[in-house]
Each structure stands twice: as structure tokens, then as C-alpha cells.
């Protein structure tokens, strides 16, 4: 509204809003999933000296493949989905792709393929289920990327520091994400099969017991 001609010129008149047609280019979070965050590639690097560890996608390859499929810039921000995914209502047309760990995907209750550019119509609801099998993170890329401010050179979320991404935290129900107005509606492209092969096995990751292993975070039984 504020960039509309009457306001931009500083000369609005009493009834100037009557003819204004406004279309929100937003995505509303109906449910957020286990932990869904905004991340970009290569992330926030080079700030260890001031106490900021690297931030960015855990599976940068999957996010980059999604951006490549949609024709996005390599550093376009997307959503990183951990274990279970969000339900999103689109208030504008969009083209999206889901890459990474296999996860159930539907639009308005109709199952949709992964690793494919999908046209989502305004008013539609996209739902992501729970990851099954190997892998823990999937990525939802949107044509043009998620619009959030850069912080220390990146849009990536750093939850412990509470900055970057959408308010420095994982998404919550009721959040509203902004995306660019869709100008290229081309959809249907798929990633080549050799670029989206499944993980061969579930791997064990060795960890060192640290301060976040204290009882207020994890019970002894859970650590075992």
C-alpha cells in the first residue's frame, strides 16, 4: 500500500484506497512441524572470532538442488524441515519444490511428487508429513526465495543466538512468510534420478557429552 502512487508521492486523497487492488504475496503457517527454520547457502560463516558459529542448512546439497530446480539464485533462502513438516496456506500463486529426505507431500489433500517443481495456486494448502527411513531433514524451496533480512551476511536462522531467519527462531503457527510475486509460472521440471537417490543406510553419529546433556535438557534414560 505504501508504495502505491498516492502514498509514494505524499499526496493521498480521501478515497484513494477505494480503487486499490491489494494481493498479499505471503504464506501463512497453519502448523509448524517439529522444527522448521529459514536457511540459506552457504550460510553465516566467518564469525567464530565474535562467538557466532557457522549457521546454514544441515544438508546444503538438498537445498541447492531445490534452488537449481526452480531457477533460483544459489543463495535463495528456503525452509529446512526437521523430522516432521509444516502445513502452509498460500495467499498467492507460487512454484515450490521439496528435496532432501523423503517426506509425504500433499496440496489440498492430493499427494504430490518430491523433487519436482509444483505450481501452487493462491488459497491452496500445502502439507508435509513425517520423514520415514534414512534422513532427518527435507527442504521446501520457493521460486524467488523466502524474503527475510540478511544478518551478518546471511538469512540463515541461528536459534541459540536468536537471530537470522524469521525472528531468529523456528516457525510457529500464525507466522506469515513473505515471498516475491510470481512472474515465472513454469512448473513440472524434475530433478534427474541420479541426483536424488536415497541414503543407503542410517548412520551412527558420535557425540561428546556437553552442557546441553544436563538433566534439564535430556533425561538419563533419553541419553541412553
Model-derived regions: residue spans:
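Conserved short loop/turn motifs at secondary-structure junctions
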Residues: 1-4, 82-84
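Catalytic cores of soluble metabolic enzymes centered on carboxylation/carboxyl-transfer
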Residues: 2-25
Amino acid at each position: 500500500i505504501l508504495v502505491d502512487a498516492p502514498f509514494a508521492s505524499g499526496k493521498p486523497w480521501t478515497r484513494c484506497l477505494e480503487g486499490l487492488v491489494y494481493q498479499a504475496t505471503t504464506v501463512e503457517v497453519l502448523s509448524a512441524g517439529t522444527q522448521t527454520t529459514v536457511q540459506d547457502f552457504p550460510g553465516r560463516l566467518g564469525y567464530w572470532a565474535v562467538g557466532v558459529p557457522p549457521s546454514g542448512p544441515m544438508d546444503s546439497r538438498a537445498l541447492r538442488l531445490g534452488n537449481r530446480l526452480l531457477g533460483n539464485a544459489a543463495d535463495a533462502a528456503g525452509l529446512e524441515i526437521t523430522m516432521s513438516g509444516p502445513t502452509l496456506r498460500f495467499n498467492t500463486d507460487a512454484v515450490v519444490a521439496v528435496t532432501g529426505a523423503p517426506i509425504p507431500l500433499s496440496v489440498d489433500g492430493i499427494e504430490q511428487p518430491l523433487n519436482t517443481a509444483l505450481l501452487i495456486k493462491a488459497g491452496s494448502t500445502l502439507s508435509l508429513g513425517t520423514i520415514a527411513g534414512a534422513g532427518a531433514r527435507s527442504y521446501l524451496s520457493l521460486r524467488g526465495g523466502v524474503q527475510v533480512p540478511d544478518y551478518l551476511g546471511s538469512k540463515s536462522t541461528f536459534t541459540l543466538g536468536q537471530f537470522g531467519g524469521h525472528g531468529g527462531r523456528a516457525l510457529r503457527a500464525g507466522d506469515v512468510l513473505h515471498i516475491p510475486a510470481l512472474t515465472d509460472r513454469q512448473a513440472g521440471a524434475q530433478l534427474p534420478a541420479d541426483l536424488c537417490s536415497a541414503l543407503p543406510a542410517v548412520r551412527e553419529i558420535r557425540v561428546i557429552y556437553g552442557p546441553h546433556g544436563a538433566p534439564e535438557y535430556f533425561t538419563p534414560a533419553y541419553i541412553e
